[in-house]
């Protein structure tokens, strides 16, 4: 069992405002006393007993920490330190203070495909790095893509929250991971073996949302959403996509493929002509998209 720093985190950090929370985790802004530097402290509630359903299991916490310790990339969040007390494991993480990508885009009245691809290239670069290490994130969605600083012409993004991430070991199958219904791949819905391909599906959903503000598979209920995902039941509605380029739609179509083996890989995505145009004019001719963001 991995042992984390048992000292009192309050001796080393002043904690401030809450930045966000999940089922068993709370993230707060904090300041390191010795340096004055600001970080984000993620307090993960530990599961008391193996039979308990409250809190996060030791195995899951150690897996998240192990993955965070391994990664170092401009588009991925960085781990600073890990503390532990009787009730929580506390991850001291890089502070990503610019808010969610989704909220940033929701504030803009319109965005070009060129602007959307500026963000997507960063997401793809981050995922390329993770996949090169055989790490699947399994929870890619707009809420887990944060801006470092929203008040610059071309904001930099960071992929956050590795609570569901796994190392994909060949011969070692995962089936039981579950993220947010709108973004999960059909193989997750159908409890089939999972791999890096599941992230590529999620990138397809994110791309659809960035260009339209609409969610491709969202139904009135969780069950309806999952049924839509499993059946790959989506369309490019004229209301949202009448001015979207054929290349952008092709990019999405090649990701929202039911068979994981026929889906674009991260390498394919980076080489797709919408992301890597053969000539500049091809990129500049991309039409305006007018999103109507609905959370």
What is each of the regions a protein language model found here?
Residues 16-23, 27:
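Protein kinase glycine-rich loop
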Residues 26-48:
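Glycine-rich ATP phosphate-binding loop
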Residues 44-71:
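Conserved N-lobe beta3->alphaC-helix segment of eukaryotic protein kinase catalytic domains
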Residues 82:
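Activation-segment/catalytic-loop signature of the eukaryotic protein kinase fold
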Residues 87-100:
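Conserved short submotifs of the Hanks-type protein kinase catalytic core
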Residues 119-120:
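Activation segment signature within eukaryotic-like protein kinase domains
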């Amino acid at each position: 069992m991995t042992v984390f720093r048992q000292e009192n985190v309050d001796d080393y950090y002043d904690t401030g405002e809450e930045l966000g929370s999940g089922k068993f985790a709370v993230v707060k802004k904090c300041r390191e006393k010795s340096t004055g530097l600001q970080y984000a402290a993620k307090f993960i509630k530990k599961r008391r007993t193996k039979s308990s359903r409250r809190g996060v299991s030791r195995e899951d916490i150690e897996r998240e920490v192990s993955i965070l310790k391994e990664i170092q990339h401009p588009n991925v969040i960085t781990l600073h330190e890990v503390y532990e007390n009787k009730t929580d494991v506390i991850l001291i993480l890089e502070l990503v203070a610019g808010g969610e990508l989704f909220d940033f885009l929701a504030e803009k009245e319109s965005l070009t495909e060129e602007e959307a691809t500026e963000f997507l290239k960063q997401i793809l670069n981050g995922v390329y790095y993770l996949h090169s290490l055989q790490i699947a994130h399994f929870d890619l969605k707009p809420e887990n893509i944060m801006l470092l600083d929203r008040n610059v012409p071309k904001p930099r993004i960071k992929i956050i929250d590795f609570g569901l991430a796994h190392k994909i070991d060949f011969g070692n199958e995962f089936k039981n991971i579950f993220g947010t219904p709108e973004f999960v791949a059909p193989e997750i819905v159908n409890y089939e073996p999972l791999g890096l391909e599941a992230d590529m599906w999620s990138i397809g959903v994110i791309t659809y949302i960035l260009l339209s503000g609409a969610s491709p598979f969202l139904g009135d209920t969780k069950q309806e959403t999952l049924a839509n995902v499993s059946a790959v039941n989506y369309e490019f509605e004229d209301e949202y996509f009448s001015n979207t380029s054929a290349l952008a739609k092709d990019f999405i179509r090649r990701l929202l493929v039911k068979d994981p083996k026929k889906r674009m890989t991260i390498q394919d995505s980076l080489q797709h002509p919408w992301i890597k145009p053969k000539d500049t004019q091809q990129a500049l001719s991309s039409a305006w998209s007018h999103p109507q963001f609905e959370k």
